[in-house]
Amino acid sequence: MNSITAAVAVTSLMFAAQASAQWVKYPDSSIQWTRDGKPNLSEGAPKARDGKADLSGVWLPEPDPNGTPQGVESISGTVIPRYMLDITADLKPEDVPFRPSTEALFKQHLQSQGKDDPIAHCQPTGVPGLGAIPLPYKIIQMPRLIAILYEENSVFRQIFLEGRRLVNDPEPRWMGYSSGKWDRDTLVVDTVGFNDRSWLDRLGHPHSDALHVIERFRRRDAGHLEIEVTIDDPKAYTKPITYTQKATLVPDEDLLEYFCSENEKDVQHYK
């Protein structure tokens, strides 16, 4: 089994049972619906009461973020977003800006064929990887705070909008610490303060505790969200890595709780 096949297999086992774990057929009244009961996802992007772009809703990462069939189909039939599998999918192998120690660790992760993947042991996926997992997440928007609730492991993150400064040398966390600001209709989020225990993707690209993630959220229209992700980690990579993950609104579904430890049946096979 090669490294990519192993990564896809691990991902399939982790998410096959949760692929349709939403509260279905409860329509979102904040968007328009056609006479035949379908959501109008191409109408203009809504505005919040304060005039900012409204990012609220339940979103599902798209498998083909560049508009081409580049997602990888898992053994369960779920199409995995390409950046969940590989954040460097747009780069040639020789152009990945590894530092030597990072490249050595990445090769070690590849050789493990998924058994060392933190999510295979029910540890959090972390940021930005949660935005590429084929499970829904909900954005709740308020003037001074945006909360993102993820179905995967029922975790959440807070993005503070009141001008809060990111502290130096904070207590390391899986999700980091996020502060955001508006650039016209784009929400720009800076997140720092990570531990170094998560992987950036399922192939095993590592990061250090110096990771700085910059996300630019833009709602293109009612039904489509684009998140430009920049990974800036000077300890691990010689220059930033950027990709764009897209998501589609799922206006007639909601989240259900999901805990990996409650469903886990696979760790014994990695021993």
Question: Language-model features: where?
Answer:
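N-terminal secretory signal peptides that target proteins for export/translocation
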Residues: 1-2
